């Protein structure tokens, strides 16, 4: 149905074409469905493809079992198979990539040869080209990823600027937002691990939790007043796994140099030092309606302990 639809068909069977020039070049391909101007235009021998929308699957020649729904969806696919694209320009640039699923405007739009990616949400995995085994759920999640592999992003703008980082997991809007090349990171919570572009093997759990280096684990932001559990933390102390044992560490002499003090924590200064991202109203992300939710507790909570710089100096003096 439509001018030039199925014009070149020779032995292809069970094809349906609706729209000007739909399935225009098909010769022997079978079981294809094309709906929209120039949909599946270049298909020759490809089978079991479904294209709905103007120029959807336009360049497909021999690719099989692809489904495209939306203007320009899977537009440049040639031999890629088992791809599903739903939304304007979704998987638009895919050529030979296989087993990709894109749902949302411009999702996986730049993918060319990447395989086994899943993108759900407008502009999710937008610039992925060759990355494989990535999963993005949420608007602009993994938006800038190009060649990064095995990343999982759940939440709007999660892993937004990741380009080449691998094996990252981000759950929560804006989690791991600024990561570009860091790998093996985990962020769970709204704004968790927001800053830091190249850290690796770090974990941030909780709203607005900040990571400042690789190989860190952080629980909660600086508004947290208690972290506890049924048992205490443990650390490796087994002599079987320690080498070069020597009694060279200062003991009592080091303790005598320490100066116990009482203090209040200036959380506003800490936020500035850690570059905690600001909200739209300019307040810290640990604030609500312009007032820090926990400030009354800060003011009342007198702490005791040591000054880190003084402990460091004592250690240096004793070698």
Language-model features: locations:
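Intrinsically disordered, low-complexity regions of eukaryotic proteins
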Residues: 132, 151-152, 166, 240
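Conserved SAM-binding site of S-adenosyl-L-methionine-dependent methyltransferases, i.e.
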Residues: 5-6, 12, 22-23, 29, ...
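Trimeric beta-solenoid/beta-helix "fiber body" segments of extracellular/virion adhesins
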Residues: 3, 20, 37, 54, ...
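Extended alpha-helical scaffolds used as interaction platforms
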Residues: 1, 5, 16-18, 33-35, ...
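Small/polar residue-rich beta-strand/coil "junction" motifs that cap repeat-based extracellular fibers
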Residues: 175, 179-251, 256-258, 285, ...
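Intramolecular chaperone/auto-protease modules of tailspike-like proteins
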Residues: 236-319
């Amino acid at each position: 149905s439509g001018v030039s639809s199925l014009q070149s068909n020779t032995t292809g069977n069970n094809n349906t074409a609706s729209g000007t020039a739909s399935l225009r070049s098909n010769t022997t391909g079978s079981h294809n469905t094309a709906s929209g101007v120039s949909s599946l235009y270049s298909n020759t021998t490809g089978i079991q493809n479904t294209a709905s929308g103007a120029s959807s699957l336009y360049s497909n020649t021999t690719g099989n079992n692809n489904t495209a729904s939306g203007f320009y969806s899977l537009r440049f696919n040639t031999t890629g198979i088992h791809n599903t694209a739903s939304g304007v320009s979704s998987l638009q640039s895919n050529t030979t990539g296989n087993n990709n699923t894109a749902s949302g405007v411009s999702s996986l739009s730049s993918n060319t040869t990447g395989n086994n990616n899943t993108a759900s949400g407008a502009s999710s995995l937008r610039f992925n080209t060759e990355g494989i085994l990535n999963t993005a759920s949420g608007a602009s999640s993994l938006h800038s990823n190009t060649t990064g592999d095995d990343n999982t992003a759940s939440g709007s703008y999660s892993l937004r600027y990741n380009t080449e980082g691998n094996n990252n997991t981000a759950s929560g809007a804006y989690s791991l937002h600024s990561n570009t090349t860091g790998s093996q990171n985990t962020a769970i919570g709204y704004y968790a691990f927001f800053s830091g572009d190249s850290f690796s093997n770090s974990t941030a759990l909780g709203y607005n939790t900040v990571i400042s280096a690789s190989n860190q684990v952080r629980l909660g932001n600086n508004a947290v007043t208690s972290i506890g559990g049924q048992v205490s933390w443990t650390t490796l102390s087994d002599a079987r796994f320690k080498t070069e044992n020597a009694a060279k560490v200062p003991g009592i002499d080091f303790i005598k140099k320490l100066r116990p003090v009482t203090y209040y924590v200036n959380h506003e200064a800490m936020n500035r030092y850690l570059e905690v991202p600001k909200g739209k109203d300019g307040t810290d992300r640990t604030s609500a309606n312009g007032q820090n939710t926990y400030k009354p507790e800060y003011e009342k909570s007198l702490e005791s302990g040591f000054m880190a710089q003084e402990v460091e100096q004592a250690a240096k003096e004793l070698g």
